[in-house]
Amino acid sequence: MFDIQEELKKLPDKPGVYIMKDENGEIIYVGKAVVLKNRVRQYFQSLSNQTPKVRAMVAHIKEFEYIVTDTELEALILECNLIKKHRPKFNILLKDDKNYPYIKVTMNEDFPRILMTRRVEKDGAKYFGPYTSAYAVRETIDLVKKLFPVKTCSKVLPRDIGKGRPCLNYHIYQCLGPCQGNVSKEEYRFMMQDVCNFLGGRQEDIIKKLEKDMKEAADNLEFERAARIRDKINSLKHIAEKQKIISTAMEDQDVIAFAKSETDSCIQVFFIRGGKLIGREHFILEGTSDVSDSELMTAFVKQFYSSAAYVPGQIILQEDIDEMEIIEKWLSGKRGTKTYIKVPRRGEKLKLVEMVSKNALIELNQFKERIKKEAALAKEGMEKLKELLNLDRLPRRIEAYDISNTGSTEIVGSMVVFENGSPKKSDYRRFKIKSINVQNDYQSMQEVIFRRLKRAQKEMTEKDEGGGKDVGEKGAGFGTLPDVLLVDGGTGHVNAVRSVLEELDFNIPVYGMVKDDNHRTRGLVTGEREFDLSKDIVLLRFVTAIQDEAHRFALEYNRKLRAKRYSGSVLDNIEGVGPKRKKELIRHFGSVKAIKEAEPGEIAKVKGISRDLAQKIYDYFRQQE
């Protein structure tokens, strides 16, 4: 039994991070302290002086842990990492923070590539972002490919140089043709550095360089090449003209301001490079109904810059933040040179902050309006589904199932949950099919439903005995039964599931989601009839969203298992090839198939692979033939 009062006496007079947990051992809050003893004790003393949010959190605390650090800076870094990892419900959180995409330029490779990623690693690559949508990333990458002749094929270089013919892009001057050896590693990297400068808002530097190249081409009577360079210069100038000059200080700045409502907050960031606005992003924050402006801004700065790809020399804020000195020190360490945090009270910088704040308010109002519309459509969808299927009650909890496989391997099932018409991702579940190893959708679906309902029986029994969770409680999982059950498939799937429901004595309505010849949702079927959805666009979209989500979730798991089998299993069998070397091999060659076809000398070029190990890898694949 954890005795909080006794444990409070043991707290040290040192900096560190404290971790609050509830009765289920779930982390509900993470914080940092200059002196752990003083900070943690404050939560349990004079609660009347605390905010309602803090009082609510303390009521849930059943135990706490702490990690001592040598310095306050170390505590700050650890706090940021733990919040990002565990996303505790009483911390202020960026909405879906873990999913923000970045642009990655693989400057750690001989012939760098440009791609989208959701993970920032210390691997020598250059990262730009975060962006708030994958669409924005893809749009930017497409623009880069129009302006710069970067390679877009899947060839692994330098391994594939000279293998095969060049693609169409090479012939229309949209690629330099590194796969043909037409450009050296140094020349290609030089061009990719221009790409990085462009993504960083340094168009003027690129334009000056291109104007010099254009003059040189014209002097050498290479008029076609000069014309292509001229067109690229015009495109870059057009982009630069659209980037409004909003600061007379020709330096790199991030300007951050916010807008708040009773329940939500929106923070807007303007990215200013060389005095020009090169981009902006907005972020919705959860759990801000009862926090001060300073607390809100502090939490955002910590979370945003803990994963930001770039830290500018100056960060301009709307509001003072706590621990400004230590946060400045942390950001300067990430940047490599000094970063200054400023909160302007007058002048040009204050006007900048006010402009960003107005934009944050616009984004917040649009967000609230969108949420309102989505809730109304979800409610209408549930009501129409109840009416169409003649259900006894509104289907507030809908569970949908799908099966995905690669022939007779990677057979998996998905369970997605829609609660009050919206996805409840915390209740999603994945199933790896165990009872069969052949492609059989009916049996696979039966296994998934059987396992799900057996778990429900177990949890309901535990609840009756006093150990379970209530319906709707976080972590309730399988103990919460659906109002309606939807499966991807037709009458055969419905009948297969009904036999399981009867066997386990559950009375849950079940329907199959069927598609037309174009693989689009058409209707719902029972064993006896089909309900046509085409006449009601709201209901059709509602069911389509559920079916698509079930399919996406199943396919995602199938691909994950398939990738693991292809990229991991063979290399794992080779002595001396651990996780790091395996990662380097895949990064260099692109696939296990390419490693298998490589000669020992080529394998030995991979970082961390000796000549002896390269020979061992080569011999292993020869023995498997």
From Swiss-Prot:
Its main location: cytoplasm. Interacts with UvrB in an incision complex. Residues 13-92 form the GIY-YIG domain. This is UvrABC system protein C. The UvrABC repair system catalyzes the recognition and processing of DNA lesions. UvrC both incises the 5' and 3' sides of the lesion. The N-terminal half is responsible for the 3' incision and the C-terminal half is responsible for the 5' incision. It is found in: Cytoplasm. Belongs to the UvrC family. CDD domains: GIY-YIG_UvrC_Cho (cd10434). GO terms for biological process: nucleotide-excision repair; SOS response. The keyword DNA repair applies. GO terms for cellular component: cytoplasm; excinuclease repair complex. Keywords: Cytoplasm, DNA damage, DNA excision, DNA repair, Excision nuclease, SOS response. GO terms for molecular function: DNA binding; excinuclease ABC activity. Pfam families: GIY-YIG, HHH_5, UVR, UvrC_RNaseH, UvrC_RNaseH_dom. The keyword DNA repair applies. Residues 204-239 form the UVR domain.
